[in-house]
Curated annotation (Swiss-Prot):
The modification Glycine radical is found at G100. This is Autonomous glycyl radical cofactor. Acts as a radical domain for damaged PFL and possibly other radical proteins. The keyword Lyase does not apply. GO terms for cellular component: cytosol. Residues 5-125 form the Glycine radical domain. Disulfide bonds: none annotated. The keyword Transferase does not apply. It comes from Vibrio atlanticus (strain LGP32) (Vibrio splendidus (strain Mel32)).
Amino acid sequence: MIQGIQITKAANDDLLNSIWLLDSEKNEARCVVATSGFEADQVISAADLGEYESREVAIEAAPRIEGGQHLNVNVLKRETLEDAVAHPENYPQLTIRVSGYAVRFNSLTTEQQRDVIARTFTESL
């Protein structure tokens, strides 16, 4: 388990106010920041810190998997979009979300319009 600490008191003055990540499984300490004596990302044995007092510092783990999900919400009926394909003159202001931006439905090609309808209205996931 990894724990973040800020050293508040130590025999070694270089450790004072420094921030470390302690890995209890490897018995190692990684320097996050120190005013002198240690470099950022320097890894030492936890025992090399000697005696010290510290306070816990909250750390946030980076996500292990990059990416995520994106959701475009269009509150429409299928019939409305299908009618807009058949009668675009009746829907000059119909705006939808596509790939994170707003677009007029009539400015899309017929193929793109059909794709939007197919992706927006599905029977199941």
